Amino acid sequence: MTYARIQGVGSYIPQQILSNADLEKMVNTTDEWIMQRVGVRERHVIANSPDNTTTMAVDAAKRAIEMAGIDPAVIDMIIVGTATAEYYFPSTACLVQKHLNLREDIPAFDINGACAGFVYALSIADQYIRNGGAKHILVIGVDSLTKVVDWKDRSTCILFGDGAGAVILQAHKEPGILNTILHANGDYSDLITAKSGVWERESVPHLHMYGKEVFKLAVTKLGEIVDEIIEKSGLKQSDIDWLIPHQANLRIIEATAKRLGLPRERVILTIEQHGNTSAASIPLALDAAVRAGKIKRGDTLLLEAFGAGLAWGAALLKL
C-alpha cells in the first residue's frame, strides 16, 4: 500500500508583531480580556512590509523543501489552501511554481476552505498519492487575514495574524496519512464572511463573524469529527500522541482536547504567539513543534480545523 508521508515542514511569519498592548491603543479592549476570551497575546502582521500571501507561501515552501532534502525538480503537484490570494487569478499555486522555478508538467491550484484550507488541501494531496497520481506534493496553507480585518471591530481584529506553513508529502510504503475527513454546511455560510467577490463587493472588504454562534458550532462539529476519524481509523483516543488543532480560540481547543482525554502538554499550542492565521495555523504549529523536537518521527498526530463555509475537517497521520 502507498501512503502519503510528510517528509519536510516549513513556515514563515512576518517580522512585525502586533501585541495586545498595541490593540489597547486602537480599540476598547485589554490584554486580560483578550487572553481570557481567546488566548492570544500577540500576532505577526504584514502591515507595511513587502510580505504578501505569495511571498510567505514561497518562503515556507523553501524551508519545507530544505528539510525534506529533495530536489525541487521532483515536485509533481502544488496545492495551496488560502482565502486571501494575492489576485483573483493567477492562482497562488502558479505564482509559487514561478518563484520556485518548478517544472511545467505539473498541476498547481488553490483551494479555499478558509481556516480549514490546509486540512482540505492535505486530504486532496493524500488521495492523489494513494491513487498514484503524484509522488511529491507541495502542500501550503497561507493567509493574510489582517488585510481584511476591520480594525475598528474589537470582536474580530483581536483574533488574526498572518503567516504560511508548508509540507512536502511523499509517496512511501511506511504509514503516513491514515485518514482524512472533510465536512461542510453552507446553511451557515453567513456566519463568517468577507464579501469582496465579483458579484457582491464591499468598498473595503471586511471580515464579519457571528462569534457566539461560530464558537458553539465549532465545539460541536470538531468534537464530532475527531470521534469520527478515530473510529474510522480503527484507533482509540489513547493512540493519539499529539493534537494539532486550528489555532482559533483557546477555549475551543481545550474543549476538543478534553473530548479526546488529552492533557494540555499533548496539545500543540501557538495561538498565544501567532493568533489565528487561518489556513496557515496548523502547518505553522506543526513546523514549530517539529523544529522544537516535541514531535518525532513515528508519532501519531490528529489535525483538526473549522472555518468559514462552514467547512471543517480532520486528518490522522503518522509523522
From Swiss-Prot:
Region feature ACP-binding, mapped onto this chain: 247-251
Entry coiled-coil feature ranges: none
Top EC class for this record: transferase
Pathway assigned to this chain's UniProt record: Lipid metabolism; fatty acid biosynthesis
Disulphide bonds in the chain: none
InterPro entries per the UniProt record, alphabetical: ACP_syn_III_C (IPR013747), ACP_syn_III_N (IPR013751), FabH (IPR004655), Thiolase-like (IPR016039)
Location, primary (coarse class): cytoplasm
Compartments (UniProt record): Cytoplasm
Cellular component, GO, one term: cytoplasm
GO terms of biological process kind: fatty acid biosynthetic process
Catalytic activity: malonyl-[ACP] + acetyl-CoA + H(+) = 3-oxobutanoyl-[ACP] + CO2 + CoA
GO molecular function: 3-oxoacyl-[acyl-carrier-protein] synthase activity; beta-ketoacyl-acyl-carrier-protein synthase III activity
UniProt-listed Enzyme Commission number(s): 2.3.1.180
Recorded family membership: Belongs to the thiolase-like superfamily. FabH family.
Domain notes: The last Arg residue of the ACP-binding site is essential for the weak association between ACP/AcpP and FabH.
Function: Catalyzes the condensation reaction of fatty acid synthesis by the addition to an acyl acceptor of two carbons from malonyl-ACP. Catalyzes the first condensation reaction which initiates fatty acid synthesis and may therefore play a role in governing the total rate of fatty acid production. Possesses both acetoacetyl-ACP synthase and acetyl transacylase activities. Its substrate specificity determines the biosynthesis of branched-chain and/or straight-chain of fatty acids.
Subunit structure as annotated in this protein's UniProt entry: Homodimer.
This protein's name: Beta-ketoacyl-[acyl-carrier-protein] synthase III
Biological classification of the source: Bacteria, Pseudomonadati, Pseudomonadota, Gammaproteobacteria, Legionellales
